[in-house]
Amino acid sequence: YVVYNYDQKIWYVGSLARTSWVDRGVYQYPMATDSNLVYNHEKGNDNDGTAFTSFIESSPIDVQDGDQFVFIRRMIPDVSFDKSDTGLSNDNKQAVFSLKAQRSPNGGFVKTSTNTVNSSTELNHLRLRGRSFGLRVESTTQGVNWRLGTPRVDLRADGDR
């Protein structure tokens, strides 16, 4: 497949075993066929009733070009679960936030803080220090549709210990 993202002006290329397609218009969703099966695409949050992992992951984020160690102690997650399946309780509408710390560019990520977030989570307390950080948000719960806003972190300058 080939996808052009008009907003970011970039192309995505991948593979998906489908032999014919019909766009939405006559039908509510795009449809495709493969191996004598017809698939509805872009419908729901799951893979035909089975949950799959959805995630977004950042590249390393430097603070002061990586010249300063910083300590992260709190995070406001800013995630919305508004379009999740209506039968799910608020406790089941959740995503996992993983913050990873890196001491040097070639050293790899050494520490991780993992926090489960649901629709009532306003603040996460954590302890993580490094020169740069990576963020991954993921969900593996069936029926969950999440949207990431702008997470905020409370960070302070820290020494090189």
Residue ranges and their predicted role:
Residues Y1-R161:
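Beta-sheet repeat architectures centered on beta-propellers
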